[in-house]
Swiss-Prot record:
This is Growth-regulated alpha protein. GO terms for cellular component: extracellular space. Has chemotactic activity for neutrophils. Contributes to neutrophil activation during inflammation. Hematoregulatory chemokine, which, in vitro, suppresses hematopoietic progenitor cell proliferation. KC(5-72) shows a highly enhanced hematopoietic activity. It comes from the Eukaryota. The keyword Secreted applies. The keyword Ribonucleoprotein does not apply. Gene3D superfamilies: 2.40.50.40. PROSITE patterns: SMALL_CYTOKINES_CXC. The gene is Cxcl1. It comes from Mus musculus. It is found in: Secreted.
């Protein structure tokens, strides 16, 4: 192979390998807590689904996020007794 062609091929491969990094592709989904404020409770009939995010490197708190029937999301206080009851009721409704 001609040295100029080899150099050109190496440069193209290097450019291709680093272009993914240059696009700004996210490394992780979210690296912070999603809930800035929490509610002590909400009526169960307004909840469509419930998501419990355990604490981890992204956030030191367990987060409970309820998706409401109107499409909005609400952050619930995982320490509140009413929220704990809601989580238990939602878990009982999930088939094993």
């Amino acid at each position: 192979m001609i040295p100029a062609t080899r150099s050109l091929l190496c440069a193209a491969l290097l450019l291709l390998a680093t272009s993914r990094l240059a696009t700004g592709a996210p490394i992780a989904n979210e690296l912070r807590c999603q809930c800035l404020q929490t509610m002590a409770g909400i009526h169960l009939k307004n909840i469509q689904s419930l998501k419990v995010l355990p604490s981890g490197p992204h956030c030191t708190q367990t987060e409970v996020i309820a998706t409401l029937k109107n499409g909005r999301e609400a952050c619930l206080d995982p320490e509140a007794p009413l929220v704990q009851k809601i989580v238990q009721k939602m878990l009982k409704g999930v088939p094993k």
